Amino acid sequence: MFSFGIILLTVVSFTNAQWRQDMFTTAENQLRSIVQNGQTLLDFIYQERQKHGGGNMTGGSLMSHNVAYSSFINDVETRLADMEQATQELVRIMRTCPDAPLAPPPPTNVIVESTTIDNVSSIVVKWDPPFNPPENMQYKVYFVPVDQNGMQTAGEVVFRICDSTQTIASITDLTPRSRYRIRVGAVAGAVAEGASMPLNVKTPDIIPSRVRNVMVKSSTANTIT
């Protein structure tokens, strides 16, 4: 069990709702496929139009006694109308979508120190604010236990610091001779974040407590009692 000191904090779960590069790639591939399929359909429609260019047209529609073919034509018309409406709606949404906040630069000069007193270890994290920080900026301190190979051994815990002027924090009630990975993030808005590079730290070995109430009753040249 461990605790976080110096300021009031909240343990939070973190979900990044920003665009990722793989999301851009997926959207681009989907749109290219839609455009390609649309061109293929346009070619089919052109070919059908050429076939029936001299056919019996009444009110702009082909008079056909083939029920299956008539059903096919109606199905194409309905699906194309649905596709047109869906793409128009998506364009409208994208045009009115609010811009995502830009991630602030990460905190700088992050320093991690550890101590062990009375068989209890603690870690103190210090940092400098990012250059030109945005308004209403907050910090997050990420903390996770690791093994000697740097592999994560438990879930990552995130502490939120709501006061942007607070640039020092402590994590207490840790185990001596244990390894941890720490990083600090500067957060703007709901999810936009710039995080520092992670730092590994090992808590010191047990340091015996100071002996108290030492009394000297008598002494000679060679003995002390």
Curated annotation (Swiss-Prot):
The keyword Secreted applies. SUPFAM superfamilies: Fibronectin type III. PROSITE patterns: FN3. InterPro entries: FN3_dom, FN3_sf, Ig-like_fold. It is found in: Secreted. Residues 1-17 form the signal peptide. It holds the Pfam family fn3. The keyword Secreted applies. Residues 106-206 form the Fibronectin type-III domain. GO terms for cellular component: extracellular region. Keywords: Secreted, Signal. SMART domains: FN3. Component of the organic matrix of calcified shell layers like nacre and prisms. This is Fibronectin type III domain-containing protein. It comes from Mytilus californianus.
